[in-house]
Design a protein with these regions (language model features):
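Short glycine-aspartate micro-motif
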Residues: 3-7, 62-67, 108, 132-136, ...
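A mobile "lid/hinge" subdomain adjacent to the ATP/sugar-phosphate binding pocket shared
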Residues: 18, 185-244
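Short glycine-rich, Thr/Ser-proximal phosphate-binding strand/loop in the N-terminal lobe
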Residues: 2-43, 47, 80-83, 157
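Glycine-rich phosphate-binding loop plus the immediately following alpha-helix
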Residues: 13, 109-113, 167-203
Length: 245
């Protein structure tokens, strides 16, 4: 029997088919369609799952469960995405939508950093740990906390979510509507923003050359590659990023 793990990100939905030994035997990645909302997201998860199962000569009858994680706050019952700003999900009944696609197959919904920490606890760097913390750095910033060998969710289900804690008073605009959040400085989104600014200030930089000076062409990979190649503008972006982190 198999299980499916799904990571809904700000740009892609990453999926993995897991066997009984908890080893990933097949992967799938599909674009996240922000305009499609929760309903289209559930359809994409179903389509990707069928494709992975088919690659193994299997079908839904071989599927034990579906685990889905999102970069946002989940209600204590694990049913509703209260807020996931980078997905434009607000009080989204995501579990019910996904459950509708899979019928009687159990569906579980959790915060992405909590899911990552739990995975490390069972088969990763946290095996045998009683206390551990994990931070996810991507489109946003998330955190997962293990206390006493168990996942800590907190009274409101936010657990160790620090992405929207205040870092710089009156600072950069965040996707949540506030200013100065950790996420506004320590995410891939922040790297792209700062790389564009650096590129515009230094037209002789690799950042400018590799994007042809067009902001819409900038992404985190270009910024990282330029920094690795010694571009002073890109290195300054990452020095600031690390300082804030």
């Amino acid at each position: 029997m198999y299980q499916v793990g799904v990571d809904i990100g700000g740009t892609n939905i990453a999926m993995g088919l897991v066997d009984e030994a908890l080893d990933v035997v097949q992967r799938e990645s599909m674009p996240f369609e922000i305009k499609g909302g929760g309903e289209r997201t559930a359809e994409i998860i179903h389509e990707g799952t069928l494709a992975m199962l088919k690659s193994q000569g299997a079908g839904l009858y071989d599927l034990d469960s579906v685990g889905v994680v999102v970069p946002g706050s989940i209600d204590p019952a694990g049913s509703i995405v209260i807020n996931a700003y980078n997905l434009n999900f607000h009080n989204e009944l995501l579990k019910a939508r996904i459950q509708k696609q899979f019928g009687d197959i159990p569906v579980f919904l959790a915060n992405d950093a909590d899911g990552a920490a739990l995975a490390e606890l069972h088969k990763g760097a946290f095996v045998g740990c009683r206390t551990a913390v994990l931070f996810t750095l991507g489109t946003g910033v998330g955190g997962g906390l293990i206390l006493g060998g168990r996942m800590f969710h907190g009274g409101l289900g936010n657990g160790c979510e620090l992405g929207h804690a205040l870092l710089v008073s009156g600072g950069e605009q965040c996707t949540c509507g506030n200013k100065g959040c950790i996420e506004a400085y320590c995410s891939a989104t922040a790297i792209i923003r700062d790389a564009i600014r650096a590129m515009e200030k230094q037209p002789d930089s690799l950042l400018f050359e590799r994007t042809m000076g067009k902001p819409e062409r900038m992404n985190a990979k270009i910024a990282i590659d330029c920094a690795r190649d010694g571009d002073s503008a890109a290195l300054e972006v990452f020095h600031n990023y690390v300082d804030h982190l």
